[in-house]
Amino acid sequence: MSWQTYVDEHLLCENEGNHLTSAAIIGQDGTVWAQSANFPQFKPEEITGIMNDFAVPGTLAPTGLYLGGTKYMVIQGEPEAVIRGKKGPGGITIKKTNQALIIGIYDEPMTPGQCNMIVERLGDYLIEQSL
């Protein structure tokens, strides 16, 4: 299965009638493995900031999480495993696997819990596959 298939079928799938607005699978070095057509263009330093927060949880909390120039307020995640952010009625979930970052961005009517479930389910599967 291609990485694009994972994005299209597992991240952009419908969940209770809702779906993510954009999603991507990105290598921990910032290379894009696959992404939705409307995934924001991000800067390398934004991925570096995310990776630094996984290494030392809490580093993004004072400044916020940036992706594609959009600032998200960092909310409760799972140290070294999941970073969650909120911006208005939407937000972002980032799950770290052995080799990649699974990123889902949502807006209403999708809920944070639905986004978390979609992103983390795929991330957990990839971890089980040693990816």
Swiss-Prot record:
GO annotations of cellular component type: cell cortex; cytoskeleton
Keyword Cytoplasm carried by entry: yes
Signal peptide bounds: none
InterPro entries: PFN (IPR048278), PFN_euk (IPR005455), PFN_sf (IPR036140), Profilin_CS (IPR027310)
Keyword terms, alphabetized: Actin-binding, Allergen, Cytoplasm, Cytoskeleton
Pfam family, one: Profilin
Keyword Cytoplasm: yes
Subcellular localization: Cytoplasm, Cytoskeleton
Gene Ontology molecular function terms on file: actin monomer binding
PANTHER family to which the protein is assigned, alphabetical: PROFILIN, PROFILIN-2
Similarity section: Belongs to the profilin family.
Summary of the function given for this chain in its UniProt record: Binds to actin and affects the structure of the cytoskeleton. At high concentrations, profilin prevents the polymerization of actin, whereas it enhances it at low concentrations. By binding to PIP2, it inhibits the formation of IP3 and DG.
Subunit structure and binding partners: Occurs in many kinds of cells as a complex with monomeric actin in a 1:1 ratio.
Name of the protein: Profilin-2
